[in-house]
């Protein structure tokens, strides 16, 4: 029996990669959380969460990045399960959760948070709790600052601007589905380490978005920043040549996502994306080099 065969009522959800097209650090709160302005899209590539009712709780992991996943209660997937069960009551059925781990760990594309968000959505349906997005987002925020963002991504997939510590969400119009290459050479960067390496925490916020069409979006991105990039490069200098490689392969725009070290590159069309992905994969065996498309803005 494979991990995705059903023995009873079950749900499978995509936990999409979260791509920070731009990330401005605008301050820091007294409790240590940084204030951020972020333009975020979600990719059609990601992890998958499969949950079914069972006789007892269980958690299993498969996939190319399964080996680095903690199986105990420290895992965000299990924290999400337990938080929702605490909210819904002790009579909720046991569940078997399977995580197909396709995204690199500690790579700046929201893998663990997206897994937890997909778990909240799947269990909300499986347990018939009927909690609205705001309630699920509040539960998610108790687990991590980027859970509300990732919950939006798993539920809707549409681009957004996130502010505050990541909990203030607003839709962005005009962003098309972007042919996008995600690349990681195996470098893992812990988000707290990158934030600790910041030398400047008071920066200008994002300018008003101007994203109608891919060319306009790329022009807009050139006016924005990833304020975590210098800190990430100080910890992992290999990020810089990776960005140069993506630009040399014909990317319209390339940048590091989030706290790194995954980089993204936007291409003009699917054929340019496919060609670049193949060349990079052939030249760099063992790299995570995955072609994808982001989900577009609401029509």
Swiss-Prot record:
Top-rank lineage group of the source organism: Bacteria
Keyword match Kinase: yes
tRNA-binding recorded as keyword: no
Top EC category: transferase
Pathway(s) per entry: Isoprenoid biosynthesis; isopentenyl diphosphate biosynthesis via DXP pathway; isopentenyl diphosphate from 1-deoxy-D-xylulose 5-phosphate: step 3/6
A GO BP annotation: isopentenyl diphosphate biosynthetic process, methylerythritol 4-phosphate pathway
UniProt-annotated catalytic positions: 18, 146
SUPFAM superfamilies referenced in this protein's UniProt entry, alphabetically: GHMP Kinase, C-terminal domain, Ribosomal protein S5 domain 2-like
Protein's recorded name: 4-diphosphocytidyl-2-C-methyl-D-erythritol kinase
Species the sequence originates in: Brucella melitensis biotype 1 (strain ATCC 23456 / CCUG 17765 / NCTC 10094 / 16M)
Upper taxonomic lineage: Bacteria, Pseudomonadati, Pseudomonadota, Alphaproteobacteria, Hyphomicrobiales
